[in-house]
Regions:
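A structural signal for multi-pass alpha-helical bundles of membrane permease subunits
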Residues: 3-285
Length: 285
């Protein structure tokens, strides 16, 4: 009886802590949702979730055009115009690069791998100026296809994802490569017929990370996009902050909520594979 009582107490305490941490983590999102239905005075009156005088003005104002050239639907379309190519290029290039480093021995392999890892320690702010000058030479600034934001991802420049896939690939037995070679598969056939299907969860986790990071990216569009009609959601929310008339925080929070809805939907649809990819990639280092 003593052991059962202590186990029940431990279980209760464990779930109590988990529920408490969960509430603390989700409360800001719940508060943001409730604040979209409040006016400024009620928003700053406290941090409670209760809505005394609900209003839809925040959502009505969020759907208005700003400067006559862009609205929230156009901003969302602009966002996914570069997010989707960036995700695809990142996953494909990182997978190919990881396959090369993880499965082949070639001269200078360790040196190139160490150089690649060293780029992880370079802060993005150091690269902003040379990248800006280079893309200006190419004529990619303010491109209608947002080339300056995503084209570099086609060359496996997202080192974090290359490293993550290499760690996951170490869990794939090399016997499968040898069996595929015996069956007459080339290296690329082995990659997309054998390796890629087994990397499914890891590829999903890479795609989700890049999708969320790209949707939330503010500095990239700020540097390379200058036409208001091409602004993505990150710049559109900033554009909605009109300092002359005062901040309508319900409108700003409504825009913020709408901007993250797609990310939440995508994450919850793929969360099982996402968790599996993250955990499986950490089995071997």
């Amino acid at each position: 009886m003593g052991m059962n009582a202590s186990n029940k107490i431990a279980t209760f305490f464990k779930y109590f802590v988990l529920i408490l941490v969960g509430i603390i983590m989700i409360y800001p999102l719940l508060w943001m949702i409730s604040a979209t239905f409040k006016d400024n005075s009620e928003i700053f009156a406290g941090i409670g979730l209760w809505i005394k005088n609900p209003t839809l003005d925040g959502y009505r104002n969020a759907l208005n055009n700003f400067g006559g050239s862009i609205n929230i639907l156009q901003a969302m379309l602009n966002t996914y115009s570069y997010v989707l190519p960036k995700v695809i290029c990142t996953v494909v290039s990182a997978c190919v690069a990881a396959y090369g480093f993880g499965r082949f021995d070639f001269p200078g392999r360790k040196l190139l791998f160490n150089i690649m890892l060293a780029t992880l320690f370079l802060p993005q702010v150091v690269l902003n100026v040379p990248q800006y000058l280079l893309y200006n030479k190419f004529g990619w600034l303010d491109s209608p296809f947002y080339l300056a934001i995503w084209v570099h991802c086609a060359f496996a420049t997202e080192t974090y994802f290359v490293y993550q896939l290499i760690q996951f690939m170490r869990n794939v037995p090399r016997d499968l490569d040898e069996a595929a070679a015996i069956d007459g598969c080339s290296s690329f056939q082995t990659l997309y017929k054998v390796i890629v299907p087994m990397l499914g969860p890891a590829l999903v986790s890479c795609a989700l990370f890049q999708f969320m990071w790209s949707c939330n990216d503010f500095m990239g569009p700020l540097l390379y996009v200058s036409t208001p009609g091409k602004y993505p959601m990150s710049l559109f929310v900033k554009l909605s902050m009109d300092g002359d008339t005062g901040f309508a925080w319900n409108k700003i929070l409504a825009l913020s909520l709408i901007s993250i809805l797609t990310q939440l939907i995508v994450f919850f649809c793929a969360q099982d594979q996402f968790v599996e990819g993250i955990s499986a990639g950490a089995v071997k280092g």
